[in-house]
Amino acid sequence: MEGQWRIGLVGCSRGSAYGQLAHRHPRCEVAGICDSDAEALGRHQRDLGLADSRCFAAYEDLVASTPRLDAVIIGTPICFHAEQAVLALEAGIHVMSEVTASDTVDGCARIIEAVRRCGKTYMLAENTIYRPLFREWERLISEGKLGNIIYGEADYLHPIPGLLVNPKTGERYWRADRPPVHYCSHSIGPLLHLMRDRIVRAMAIGNRKTILPGAGVGAVDIQLAAFETARGAIIKMTRTQVAPRHSPIHYYSLQGTKGFVETDRRGAGFTADGQQGLVYIQGEMRQAEVLVWPELDASAPGWATLGGHGTCDYGTFVAFLHAIETGEKPWLDEVHAWDLTVPGLIAAESAQQGGKWLEVPPPPGADPPVAVSGRRAATQR
């Protein structure tokens, strides 16, 4: 493509992170923004220097604007993701959507169907996959240092009570009705990417609300989910949106048949200092060794941190840009968006049923199940 990619943003709060990256990227321009909040829209209009004609209160007007957008980045509440993604795809516009893909299984299916019908690129913006530390883990796995991965942990403990309920007015926000385990892609995303696997069964427990009892299911004190993968591995995930913790943490661990890796449990941030972790490789080490996992991509430009989360958002945006420029499928395509979203939806159902194990359906059109460890599981694509 000659010239610049015309990028539209919907949902200025989260979308502004990618807006800053698109604004600075030499091959992109922010060609339109949309938000139902007039104050937020005006603020980001000023930040990006956009004319009034490029700012919209209605998403349909952004999608229909001329000259036509090449791509749209969706940063709205999750309940709108599927509908807005499908609308853009049907208009011939590429889509990068914030996580998770949808709040329903049907929404995820509609995204897959729209991509196949319209032929445009869809990518889930699961930024944790682009944390540099996971490149180190991928190297160890590809070199066979850890053996076969048999177990993973992915805890996301992030108290955000003020984003569930307004502490002054008591108004409930949309996250108040999102079960903690619904928001699973930050946890299972990088592990499934490293394992090249998908989840076939899920269960979860946790329904008590003692910390923020007046809110919805999003204020459940804590939820624990267990997942079984197609290759027979087990993943454990713990999630809270209200339990007090400083600092919030993403904790990850992978156990293989020859060793393990894990991150810090103390809530290390996205800094140039990286974070301490552990590694053990059988036959090379007498015991687990402490080391520092990198958290910033040293090869990224100086403005790469404008999106936030270190250089993760930059890595996500560049991967999307590469996909629409080359026509290659991103790893985080519509099918893997299903794999990173639906297990959390099924786990939430399990929690409502007292922790019953439930099958996680394969994406529409996936290969038929095969036997793994004596159970039915979906074949790896």
Give residue spans per PLM region:
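C-terminal glycine/acidic-rich active-site capping loop/insertion
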Residues: 127, 229, 253, 257-332, ...
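Beta-strand-loop-alpha-helix segment that lines the small-molecule cofactor/substrate pocket
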Residues: 66, 71, 77-130, 144
